[in-house]
Amino acid sequence: MSSESTVIKVTGKSAADNYDVVVGRGLLGRLPELLGERVKRVLVIHPRALRLTGDTVRDELASAGFTALTAEIPDAEEGKHIQVAAFCWQVLGQNDFTRSDAVVAVGGGAVTDLAGFVAATWLRGVKVIHMPTSLLGMVDASVGGKTGINTAEGKNLVGAFHPPAAVLADLDTLSTLPKNELISGMAEVIKCGFIADPAILDLVEKDPSAVTDPQSAFLRELIERAIAVKADVVSEDLKETGRREILNYGHTLGHAIELVERYSWRHGAAVSVGMMFAAELARSVGRLSDADADRHRTILETLGLPITYRRDRWQGLLDGMRRDKKSRGDLLRFVVLDGIARPGILDVPDTSLLFAAYQEIAS
């Protein structure tokens, strides 16, 4: 197994949008250098479940000469609320954080979303470095500069684009994850295979059991490929004005499921069902072949990801999809495939088409 780190670069229209995603093991020691000499104060935001990890990061920074503090927030989606952001702002204010200081996010995707939002809004923007500890956080939430919190009306409806200064994806942290969380995170990896990199699908089909082994070089390759897909798309379209929409494959229905379930479903599980729905929708209008639609079902099922959802929840899902950020007026828009690695947009003026596709995944 390689001990070398892999650096995947994200570039933008300005130097401020450029940053590195470092994938490797034992990366904590790189954090002080990435923060830089101008930073004096650092707030480490972490969930309750990672208190010891957060304290370790704080102590590492303190030993390097920083004034380091921690802010403990609720686990998972419970942490993505305005009240939690306000608590973090209070800590920053009470400790005299300036524009030259920084925030470090330690945790899964919900933590990087919240910490990024806090950094984006404090003094109109301070440096943030993400240290994702989940598979989902590594391949999705920490890369791309999207930040956000949830409201009663939907997921991530309040947020900002705020690229991190760096991302440290330390693979050692994956060893602490339950198997079902690794499997859930694989949904975002598989998504990258469907929309851009078919080699991801080939690798998963070759050895699906290896995706639950956090020590395997196989899983590392999948992670690096998925990050490379996202880095490529984000480098071209930071603020989702065009191509970046393809990263929302499976997310229109997926976010609606999360809303209906009051965020009790894992994000990856919801996206898995959403991708299956998008495949059936594309098949129904003749844009995706039977073979490619069936490949969705086979790969997702093989990994143990869900591909069906409750038949009696359709109206709630439709209401949730109407709030999707891709919608334009009363027109619902979906990312669909015209083939593997050939994403496109489907505008749906008639919800009966959606209902018919939903019947193919309803249980």
Swiss-Prot record:
Cofactors demanded by this protein: Co(2+); Zn(2+); NAD(+)
Keywords per UniProt: Amino-acid biosynthesis, Aromatic amino acid biosynthesis, Cobalt, Cytoplasm, Lyase, Metal-binding, NAD, Nucleotide-binding, Zinc
Pfam families registered for this protein in UniProt: DHQ_synthase, DHQS_C
Gene Ontology terms: biological process: amino acid biosynthetic process; aromatic amino acid family biosynthetic process; chorismate biosynthetic process
GO cellular component terms given for this protein: cytoplasm
Entry function: Catalyzes the conversion of 3-deoxy-D-arabino-heptulosonate 7-phosphate (DAHP) to dehydroquinate (DHQ).
NCBIfam families according to UniProt: aroB
Stated name of the protein: 3-dehydroquinate synthase
Originating organism: Arthrobacter sp. (strain FB24)
